[in-house]
Amino acid sequence: IDDAAILIKINKELFQHGIFSSITVRVSEGRVLLTGTVDSPDKRLKAERVAWQQSEVKEVVNEIAVDKDEVTLKEVAIDSAISAQIKARMVAHAGIKSVNYSINTVGGVVYLMGIAQSQKELNSVIGISKRVKGVKQVISYVRLKHSKLRR
């Protein structure tokens, strides 16, 4: 499965539908995580349909929030800073292969996706994430390296 190709196709379609800027897409082993905020349920559903249209997609997790109020630049900056702090702490932690994870934060909610080498590593990643200032919740879509779910 070519995750990069899936990502490019989904982003291209989202751009064509005018919803690219408000949605973040992460892909891991054909599993797609959609996050962000849109102003209508129709746009949320459209993004999910776009993801499912890609032939190699195995699963779509739609965490897109519907909110009529536009997200401010300050809120985006705070969320980006949270993700950056988590990534930096993961890189500094000897027991974590940080390259195997993607992190996205929306409204203080941290979404983790990727492959953990072990339950211990995953617990460390979740713990690091929870300790960053501004984090309200951590939602993990991480799979363990040897999980039967990966096959």
From Swiss-Prot:
Keyword vocabulary terms for this entry: Repeat
Domain BON intervals: 2-68, 78-146
Cleaved signal peptide residues: none
Keyword Repeat assigned: yes
InterPro entries: BON_dom, Lipoprotein_DolP, Transpt-assoc_nodulatn_dom_bac
Keyword Lyase assigned: no
Disulfide bonds: none
Protein name: Uncharacterized protein in gshII 5'region
Organism the protein comes from: Anaplasma centrale
